[in-house]
Amino acid sequence: MGSRRVTVHHATGWDGTRLHYELSGQPLGAAPVALLNNGIGCAGYVWKYLRPLLEQHCTVLHWHYRGHGHSGEAPDGAQYTIEDCVRDMEAVMDAAEVESALVFGHSMGVQVSVESALMLPERVGGLVLLCGSHGNPLDTFQGTDRFRAFLPKIQQFVGENHMLVKLFMETFVNTRAGWWVARGEVDGRLMNREDFEPYLEHLSKMDPIVFLRLLESAAEHTTDDRLGDIAVPALVVGAERDGFTPYEVSERMAAAIPEGELLTIRGGSHTAPLEQPQLLEMAL
């Protein structure tokens, strides 16, 4: 296989936010488009093995949310919602001259992807929903809803100690200790630090206030009563040992989408696309 050709571009979001996106794989217009929606606090680490596979058959459009990666922050510092992400996704598609795409989402990217199929039905040709919820993820995080009650207190603490929290994240998150803590939520037998480190590195540099504002929106957002309106095929990937998105959430989502299909990753965690990429390759 030859070297990958990736071109870097920028779009302007609905409120003027500068948005980073990349095109790779097949020439635009010569193949279907696969659009990748990241999780919160992520800039694409989870697509390491899936993206090259897609590039063999598709034009891959990968972009960064506002306040993430190489994209800018919202001009007013406040507009960080799931719906804002969908509007930004539309702006990126417009800038790239992409009419319709097969939309992939991981973690919070599942919420963005599902909402995009409802807000932009003519732009979404299908969904691949990986290890994420269709709404209210903090109500099921680790099998309990207690984390949602903690969020306002965390937001208050970070707001009052912003620079201190930023310094802590910069010095602790992307360290051996940070990896040791993270291993408790992934399959340490199949996940190596090299694959996970880009996530820790990105998170360590992210503004915690931006992270929490988007997390607040994700916690309140749901499409639970609208899944039946999704008019495109959807492959829902659920991992048996996913503490962030319990497997039962994926089961319910797949059953509620008219053309939904469930793929089970036996023994997989929230980072199953990195732990067992061969299963996704066979399914896709």
Segments from the language model and where they lie:
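Conserved HGGG/HGGXW glycine-rich cap/lid loop of the alpha/beta-hydrolase fold
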Residues: T17-A74, A78
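Conserved alpha/beta-hydrolase "nucleophile elbow" surrounding the catalytic nucleophile
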Residues: N38-I40, A101, G105-V110, A239
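Active-site loop/oxyanion-hole signature of alpha/beta-hydrolase fold enzymes
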Residues: P52, L61-M108, M282
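Flexible "cap/lid" loop of the alpha/beta hydrolase fold
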Residues: L118, G125-K166
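Conserved alpha/beta-hydrolase catalytic His-Asp/Glu region
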Residues: L138-G143, V165-D229
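Catalytic histidine neighborhood in serine/cysteine hydrolases
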Residues: Y247-H270
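Catalytic histidine-centered segment of alpha/beta-hydrolase-like enzymes
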Residues: I265-E281
